[in-house]
Amino acid sequence: MAQDLSEKDLLKMEVEQLKKEVKNTRIPISKAGKEIKEYVEAQAGNDPFLKGIPEDKNPFKEKGGCLIS
């Protein structure tokens, strides 16, 4: 699709995208990193990768064994 557009059209699209992006609220990475860390630590108790899945609720647990005779 981009190949079908002229350079002028591509530049217009880029300007429109930049106009949208300039409206975004920006925060320093130090603050964003701290907020992400706090969120992850707060949600750690609900994370099955950290907490594990109870055996009775594990959908991937094998239902039966394999018997080769």
Swiss-Prot record:
Q: What keywords appear on the UniProt entry?
A: Cell membrane, Lipoprotein, Membrane, Methylation, Prenylation, Transducer
* GO cellular component entries: heterotrimeric G-protein complex
User: Where are its TM segments located?
Assistant: none
Read off the SMART domains from this record: G_gamma, GGL
List residues, modification Cysteine methyl ester: C66
Tissues in which the UniProt entry reports expression: Retinal cones.
Give the way it sits in the membrane.
Lipid-anchor
Show the GO MF annotations: G-protein beta-subunit binding; GTPase activity
Supply the residue numbers of the propeptide(s) excised during maturation. 67-69
Keyword Protein biosynthesis in record: no
What job does the chain carry out?
Answer: Guanine nucleotide-binding proteins (G proteins) are involved as a modulator or transducer in various transmembrane signaling systems. The beta and gamma chains are required for the GTPase activity, for replacement of GDP by GTP, and for G protein-effector interaction.
Q: Which residues are the lipid attachment points (S-farnesyl cysteine)?
A: C66
Name-wise, this protein is: Guanine nucleotide-binding protein G(I)/G(S)/G(O) subunit gamma-T2
User: Chief localization class?
Assistant: membrane
Q: How does it assemble?
A: G proteins are composed of 3 units, alpha, beta and gamma.
Annotated Gene3D superfamilies: Transducin (heterotrimeric G protein), gamma chain
Superkingdom of the source? Eukaryota
Q: One of this protein's GO BP terms?
A: phototransduction
